[in-house]
Design a protein with these regions (language model features):
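N-terminal low-complexity, acidic/polar interaction/targeting segments
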Residues: 1-172
């Protein structure tokens, strides 16, 4: 399948598998680079998500799944500047607590901010799947802000405890 996509400059669809089921909402992926080719035909690839879709009907005639899909488009509701700023602030704090360098907001496309923020962190897969099905950037950003607000107190406590333990009880 990957060879076909490369030969034809096509994207492929990605669906989350859970137990014996597949999610109904997925995302197309564009192959950016092939980092390694193996003698048996397998490849290590770097991809980037492009377009969300809903599966209408699966086709199992080939060695890989194919599907008839309906592409999903966002409703025109846009996030407020305050919501964007809050999401970036919380994301930056999470990155800092995790020991990573927060990104500069000027380097992020605000039209796809929710997907960028969710994709840059190892968040709960059920939460990410829920985001994929949401109909507007504003709705996704509000969900991300709520999620970050929920996880940050635990992260702050964990980092504080680690610092205190690492300082033999003398860290402040």
């Amino acid at each position: 399948m990957i060879s076909e996509c490369l030969d034809r400059s096509q994207h492929f669809g990605v669906l989350r598998g859970k137990e014996q089921d597949l999610a109904e909402i997925g995302c197309t992926a564009e192959i950016l680079t092939v980092t390694k080719k193996y003698p048996d035909g397998r490849m290590d690839i770097v991809t980037e998500g492009r377009a969300r879709f809903e599966v209408i009907q699966l086709n199992q005639e080939r060695s890989f799944l194919q599907a008839e899909v309906l592409y999903l488009h966002d409703q025109p509701e846009i996030a407020s500047k305050a919501e964007i700023a809050q999401a970036l602030k919380l994301h930056g704090e999470i990155m800092t607590l995790a020991g990573a360098e927060p990104e500069k907001s000027s380097e992020i496309d605000e039209r796809q901010l929710s997907f960028h923020l969710a994709g840059s962190l190892p968040l709960d897969l059920d939460f990410k799947q829920t985001l994929l099905g949401m109909k507007s950037e504003a709705e996704r950003l509000r969900a991300i802000i709520s999620f970050f607000d929920t996880i940050l107190p635990t992260m702050r406590r964990t980092v504080h405890v680690r610092r205190k333990a690492g300082g033999n009880g003398h860290a402040g």
